Design a protein with these regions (language model features):
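Thiamine diphosphate
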Residues: 1-163, ...
Length: 265
């Protein structure tokens, strides 16, 4: 078991140790890992304050000077308050800035609907050049950070709070964690952890489980080869039904004329 945010910060710290031209901007957002990062890199770790648009503007300027930039913010605020800056500054110019979102979905539900983040995947998937990740264990956190650092352009990484199970066979894009017979569950991020707690029941019912880390660009062919083995698949996550990644999968199934039935939950 590992804390997902601690894992993300651990690999950001390792990346910043290796890449001296990297910076970390916090939008008045803290965590245990952030405190460690501040002590290690006091000159490269900046708290911008509650100013999402300014943070993206500053990150863009740093990226234009060939810096690698991480921006840490609450999910619901970063994409709603700074959408224009993300779209025009980061995406249109394909700048190397990684947005680390804290509290996607209903993670901060006790704080009320202002903190719900139920359409972030839909928003970021629609942006050009943007890579989207939803890691679910230590290995996929490492893969997400590494993939961003070693490629061009912006990225968005969802990070939920809490401890998560580890999966030895996790890969960057699509992982067939558990093989089933007729029915398949497809999910990502936090929900992989929920179903991991019910592995014995899934095995008993012969229900397969696919975990997705990299949502965009998506490995269509890999999932298609898995879907061909199942009669029914169920996509489950914490998005609005009309803003779900499941809509993309539905379109994919119909475009490829697969016989697999899909239901979005």
């Amino acid at each position: 078991m590992t804390d997902l945010r601690d894992s993300i910060f651990n690999y950001i710290i390792k990346s910043m140790e290796k890449n001296k031209d990297s910076y970390f901007l916090s939008i008045d957002q803290g965590s245990f890992g952030y405190e460690i990062l501040k002590k290690k890199f006091p000159q490269r770790c900046i708290n911008i304050g509650i100013a999402e648009q300014n943070a993206i503007g500053i990150a863009s300027g740093l990226a234009l000077e060939n810096k690698i930039v991480f921006v840490y913010a609450i999910s619901s605020f970063i994409y709603s308050r700074a959408y224009e800056q993300i779209k025009l500054n980061l995406c249109s110019m394909n700048l190397k800035v990684c947005i680390i979102s804290s509290g996607p979905g209903y993670c901060y539900a006790p704080d009320g609907p202002t903190h719900y983040s139920l359409d972030d995947i839909n928003v970021f998937n629609s942006l050009p050049n943007m890579k989207v990740y939803s890691p679910y264990d230590d290995k996929t956190c490492k893969q997400a950070i590494s993939d961003f650092v070693n490629s061009k352009g912006p990225a968005y990484i969802r990070t939920d709070k809490g401890t998560f199970y580890q999966h030895s066979n996790s890969v960057l894009d699509v992982t067939h964690i558990l093989k089933g017979k007729k029915n398949l569950i497809i999910t990502h991020g936090y929900f992989v952890n929920l179903f991991a707690q019910k592995f014995d029941l899934l095995k008993q019912k012969k229900i397969g489980l696919v975990a997705i880390n990299k949502l965009k660009p998506f490995n269509d062919s890999k999932l298609i080869n898995i879907l061909k083995k199942y009669k029914n698949c169920y996509f489950i996550d914490d998005s609005w039904p009309n803003a779900s990644f499941g809509l993309y999968l539905t379109s994919l199934i119909h475009q490829r004329n697969l016989k697999t039935n899909i239901k979005i939950i």
